[in-house]
């Protein structure tokens, strides 16, 4: 999928193309409001190809295999979007980011789609990891606990769970629970389908 399409559009509005022509898909889209931009950041997973025929995938300089990246666009009205920007390209396959904001930091859960390690710090394949940053649109070229979260995405944790499509939801005070000791989200929940883990 390269564009989102309405199939029930009686008004003739059948969709808006947001991805580039050489992208193989526009998977797991999510939008998050960015106060500093006064707009939504819409991010999604893609596999890039060498041209718009999408017959030859771009391959990783680390693994030699095709891999997935994440891009983002900015919108205020969900009718007009900026051109997509490469958000996460580490030369390792990653998909399905979800974002929450707690205090001044954005926290990003993403799945490592590699079968094994994805660099020096993400050591397990097919599992979700956690990063944080004060800048939602900061780009990522390497996962590292040494990245300054003031300007980039700092790796905090990995091997969280082996699932795709994580989602973080803010709970009401009456239903809040502590997800992980020492982490600042006592009122956040990550739903997990345990029937497949």
Task: Give residue ranges: language-model regions.
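Carbohydrate-active catalytic/glycan-binding domains of CAZyme proteins
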Residues: 1-197
């Amino acid at each position: 999928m390269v564009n989102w399409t309405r199939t029930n559009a009686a008004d003739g509005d059948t969709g808006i193309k947001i991805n580039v022509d050489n992208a193989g898909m526009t998977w797991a889209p999510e939008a998050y409001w960015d106060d500093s931009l006064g707009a939504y950041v819409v991010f999604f997973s893609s596999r890039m190809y060498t041209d718009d025929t999408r017959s030859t995938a771009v391959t990783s300089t680390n693994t030699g295999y095709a891999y997935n990246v994440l891009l983002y666009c900015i919108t205020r009205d969900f009718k007009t979007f900026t051109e997509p920007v490469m958000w996460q390209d580490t030369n390792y396959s990653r998909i399905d980011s979800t974002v929450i904001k707690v205090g001044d930091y954005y926290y990003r859960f993403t799945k490592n789609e590699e079968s094994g390690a994805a660099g020096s710090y993400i050591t397990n394949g097919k599992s979700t990891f956690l990063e944080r940053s004060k800048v939602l649109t900061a780009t990522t070229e390497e996962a590292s606990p040494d990245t300054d979260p003031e300007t980039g995405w700092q790796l905090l944790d990995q091997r969280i769970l082996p699932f795709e499509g994580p989602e973080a939801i803010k709970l009401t005070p009456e239903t809040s629970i502590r997800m992980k000791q020492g982490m600042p989200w006592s009122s956040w929940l990550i739903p997990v389908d345990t029937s497949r883990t």
